[in-house]
Curated annotation (Swiss-Prot):
EC nos: 4.1.3.36
Source organism of the structure: Staphylococcus aureus (strain N315)
Designated name of the protein: 1,4-dihydroxy-2-naphthoyl-CoA synthase
Binding-site residues for substrate, renumbered to this chain: 34, 73-77, 85, 117-121, 143, 149, 246, 261
UniProt-listed Pfam families: ECH_1
Length: 273
């Protein structure tokens, strides 16, 4: 594996947020519990992803877990209380749902780099990422029904779109675990590489993506998500279209005419069929 010098962009307690040549890397840093997340972990990830979204130097975002044994094992059951996962303020939350939605609407590709276990809510995080590079030691699966939990959102509905309804039911009803090759065969990941090559492969995919039009990638992500995200997905794609329209001379003519208190001259712009 190439020894890269990742730059720390911000210090957190339960995650790492780093940068390397146009790539932001968000790492869940709780290896002692297989990178299970708490409300604080999720809040820190939301903050880091939001910063990556706004950072013009970031083209692609990588989500991973600290160490080689786990990507993420879902919510920390020791923090689970009445009505949700209890944070330092003693308020029960399921703020991971906000994180899932954020990953979907960020107009930049998000790649899951999976080493070891991606189970429970960890597998759902894998599911909502745009692409997945899996190490050959990766293990995937859902555990909710074993521990009195479930994900009736992306973790089931979108999972069924990816692997098929019969397979998704098998994953949830039986709570089995699947190795990296099985995950590849069902379409849950994009590629499988040796553990010591997984970061090299992930960076290579990022570099290839970064050669392409960011506006085209933004619209492609929004279009593919709109199919499963309903009106919220359409709103995202429409918002992206509005931002693009604001950069045109036609939109600027309307703005300038209003500011100059005159009628706009839209006749100068083409009306393509």
């Amino acid at each position: 594996m190439t020894n890269r010098q990742w730059e720390t962009l911000r210090e957190y307690d339960e995650i790492k947020y780093e940068f390397y040549e146009g790539i932001a890397k968000v790492t869940i840093n709780r290896p002692e519990v297989r990178n299970a997340f708490t409300p604080k972990t999720v809040a820190e990830m939301i903050d880091a992803f939001s910063r990556a979204r706004d950072d013009q130097n970031v083209s692609v975002i990588v989500l991973t877990g600290e160490g080689d044994l786990a990507f993420c094992s879902g919510g920390d059951q020791k923090k689970r209380g009445h009505g949700g996962y209890v944070g330092e303020d003693q308020i029960p939350r399921l703020n991971v749902l906000d994180l899932q939605r954020l990953i979907r609407i960020i107009p930049k590709p998000v790649i899951a780099m999976v080493k070891g276990y991606a189970v429970g809510g960890g597998n759902v995080l894998n599911v909502v990422c745009d692409l997945t590079i899996a190490a050959d030691n990766a293990i995937f699966g859902q555990t909710g029904p074993k521990v009195g939990s479930f994900d009736a959102g992306y973790g089931s509905g979108y999972l069924a779109r990816i692997v098929g309804h019969k397979k998704a039911r098998e994953i949830w009803y039986l709570c089995r675990q699947y190795n990296a090759q099985e995950a590849l065969d069902m379409g849950l990941v994009n590629t499988v590489v040796p553990l010591d090559k997984v970061e090299d492969e992930t960076v290579q995919w990022c570099k290839e993506i970064m050669k392409h039009s960011p506006t085209a990638l933004r619209f492609l992500k929004a279009a593919m998500n709109a199919d499963t995200d309903g009106l919220a997905g359409l709103q995202q794609m429409a918002g992206d279209a509005t931002l693009l329209y604001y950069t045109t001379d036609e939109a600027k003519e309307g703005r300038d005419a209003f500011k100059e208190k005159r009628d706009p001259d839209f006749d100068q712009f083409p009306k393509f069929p």
